[in-house]
Design a protein with these regions (language model features):
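Active-site region of the double-stranded beta-helix
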Residues: 1-138, 156-235
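Histidine-centered metal-chelating micro-motifs
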Residues: 143-144, 148-153
């Protein structure tokens, strides 16, 4: 991988599996299929990879497991296939983080790209007025934070290469798909044109304003650029 995440984990993209070092814990991956997200795509009848992405929730070094659990945190890793879904790149359908029972609120997610490049797409609301929408372009080693309560989706920004990333979230996480499914997708569809990603409004929304930006540092949260967010937790 282009960026070392701070512990011994590897993505085996040819069969969408993860390999763990001897000192690393983690589950068998869950694999998400094209069939599962068709209704959220611009073209629900499109063809594309059968397995879109593989996800392992709750991974890390065995020596850190108790500390992660005590802080009610969970670290996950995901690999996305390369390729397209009709005119769109491989992506997730989008969701909002449900109310966490322990926090009594929706919670944020902290992404870190390990290999490839991504657009972390987010929109303020899931209703007819989506409000401000951001497509944040992130490369290996860069971090993106999704605020609580925002609709968000992960998009492989390079259709020629798989995407792998890690993310911190609350341990008692949950996903709310209701608003996204009611609108047959997110407010802007990513469209591949001549190898680049462009954006087309989803007509199911009455209003939305898109901002396409690059990933940036987060000094306000004391995150050190270039240092794995897993390592920063340990330290």
């Amino acid at each position: 991988m282009e960026f070392y995440p701070g512990f011994d984990i590897e993505s085996r993209t040819q069969d969408m599996e993860f390999l763990y070092g001897d000192d690393v814990f983690g589950p068998q991956p869950e694999k998400r299929t094209l069939e599962a997200i068709r209704s959220s795509l611009q073209d629900p009848t499109c063809t594309g990879p059968e397995i879109l992405y593989s996800i392992v929730m709750d991974v890390g070094r065995k020596q850190d497991k108790a500390a992660i659990e005590e802080r009610n945190l969970l670290y996950g890793a995901v690999t996305y296939a390369k390729g397209t879904l009709g005119k769109e790149p491989v992506r997730s359908q989008g969701h909002i983080h449900a109310i966490s029972p322990s926090c009594q609120s929706s919670t944020c997610e902290v992404y870190e790209i390990w290999d490839g490049e991504a657009f972390i797409y987010m929109q303020e609301y899931g209703k007819d007025d989506a409000g401000n929408c951001y497509a944040v372009h992130a490369k290996a080693g860069e971090v993106v934070i999704v605020p609580p309560g925002w609709v968000h989706a992960t998009i492989n920004a390079n259709v020629e290469k798989p995407l792998t990333f890690g993310a911190w979230c609350v341990r008692d996480f949950g996903f709310d798909y209701e608003d996204v499914r009611a609108h047959h997708g997110i407010a802007y569809f990513p469209i591949v044109k001549e190898g680049n990603i462009t954006w087309e409004i989803n007509p199911a929304y009455k209003h939305a304003k898109l901002h396409v930006i690059s990933a940036h540092a987060y000094p306000q949260f004391a995150l050190e650029p270039g240092k794995p967010i897993y390592t920063q937790f340990v330290e």
